[in-house]
């Protein structure tokens, strides 16, 4: 029997590929307004602090290839062809959907590399993808979230358990887990956006699976705008928890992200570590999902569930 061909649109935020991309990339994020020279220099210094340009572009490509391979190996009903579409740099979502149409794709599934749904992020990705798909006559079914997937929860719980195993007994007895995601403007909550609740649910499931005693939910990497953003920020939270509970070790799990990139390698591994050093506490962070086989298997399960429920 001939396999049914299905397009798989893997969407992500995107990241500069080289230093020259930094200005146009952030100009796109700022809706066409260039960052001022001081802000641009600050961004360049952040990238330099993590060893140059973020590894995110390469990891996104590796994740997409691994996911396509896993999907096609796991079943013989569909032939999946994966494409990458990015929000703020080429290949842009719209250009990728156009490429899918040129390749003769009639049906496709889209997946954002972010576990939690929000009107601010996942909804905007799916809107851009669906509008373009409609234009080209592609039936596109979008995955909205996957924050409670058992494999996703288990991946983080296993990493946390391994981290606790590395600690001294004193650290283990005086430690706290901080579960975080990218902060978003507080105004999203007024419209009933589920983002905050979904992160809290992820944290609860991970804590149960890993059998963690002390934990807190925090937010990170907020944008530089006048609007209030979701808090507490992970750095402030670290100080508050140290002052109120005297913890000797902090374990950071930025579960809203799926790869090593600037927000993790700088905002966690540099900024949070600086706070830990200041207060005399130990800093720990389990590995990110990247292309870990268990994580890729989880994404494949998410896509297959959507395929079985939606594909004609």
Swiss-Prot record:
The record's subcellular locations are: Cytoplasm
Which top EC class applies here?
A: lyase
Q: What is any one of the record's Gene Ontology cellular component terms?
A: cytoplasm
What GO biological process terms are annotated to this protein in UniProt? heme biosynthetic process
Pfam annotation, one family: Ferrochelatase
Keyword match Lyase:
yes
Q: Record's family? A: Belongs to the ferrochelatase family.
Name-wise, this protein is Coproporphyrin III ferrochelatase
């Amino acid at each position: 029997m001939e396999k049914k061909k299905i397009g798989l649109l893997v969407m992500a935020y995107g990241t500069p590929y080289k230093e020259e991309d930094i200005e146009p990339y952030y100009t796109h994020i700022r809706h066409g307004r260039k960052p001022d020279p001081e802000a641009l220099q600050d961004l360049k210094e952040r990238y330099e602090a993590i060893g140059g340009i973020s590894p995110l572009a390469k990891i996104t490509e590796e994740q997409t290839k691994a996911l396509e391979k896993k999907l096609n190996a796991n079943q013989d009903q569909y032939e999946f062809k994966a494409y990458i579409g990015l929000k703020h740099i080429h290949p842009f979502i719209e250009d990728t959907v156009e490429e899918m149409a040129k390749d003769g794709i009639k049906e496709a599934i889209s997946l954002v590399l972010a576990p939690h749904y929000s009107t601010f992020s996942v909804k905007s990705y799916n809107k851009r993808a669906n509008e373009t798909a409609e234009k080209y006559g592609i039936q596109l079914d979008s995955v909205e979230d996957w924050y409670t997937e058992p494999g996703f929860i288990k991946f983080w719980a296993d990493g946390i358990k391994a981290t606790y195993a590395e600690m001294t007994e004193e650290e283990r007895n005086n430690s706290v887990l901080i579960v975080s995601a990218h902060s978003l403007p507080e105004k999203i909550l007024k419209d009933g956006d589920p983002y905050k609740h979904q992160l809290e649910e992820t944290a609860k499931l991970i804590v149960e699976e890993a059998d963690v005693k002390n934990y807190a939910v925090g937010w990170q990497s907020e944008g530089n705008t006048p609007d209030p953003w979701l808090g507490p920020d992970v750095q402030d939270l670290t100080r508050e928890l140290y002052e109120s509970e005297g913890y000797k070790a902090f374990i950071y799990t930025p579960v809203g992200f799926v790869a090593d990139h600037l927000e993790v390698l700088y905002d966690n591994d540099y900024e949070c570590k600086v706070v830990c050093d200041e207060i005399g506490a130990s800093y720990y962070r389990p590995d990110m999902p990247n292309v870990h086989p268990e994580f890729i298997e989880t994404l494949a399960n998410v896509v297959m569930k959507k395929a079985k429920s939606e594909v004609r």
